[in-house]
């Protein structure tokens, strides 16, 4: 569920000019993996392996996600141009599962433009959209394309999954 906010955003036209399309994001991931790197500053073997697994996950989600008719109709009913900004990183497992689906949903409307921004390259943006004080991703910020007014946010994961994550974290169980 998207949390409605109706306020000005910290995201500027300069941020959007530097943001990526989903295709550019996927190409960046492939390029970095060819160099045994990932997004962000931690290029450890573990982070690169997470990124490699996530590239496979994204391909699977891209191929298997089918939007139901009700959702397509809802997206076609959008009346105003929007920009969906998604804060993400290639090594993030939650992002690998949800970003391709969010892009497919947005693509169902000709009035929605998707822009991806790397969390670690835009701390000033990420810090405006913390989840319980943390830099949790993916984070979707929905903007009115004409006014740049923030219409709502979503993320980092669906509410039931977020509650499970919080419960496991509270019980000190592994959440990685």
Residues of each region from the PLM?
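N-terminal leader/targeting and pre-domain segments
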Residues: 2-79
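Generic beta-strand structural signal
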Residues: 82, 110, 136-140
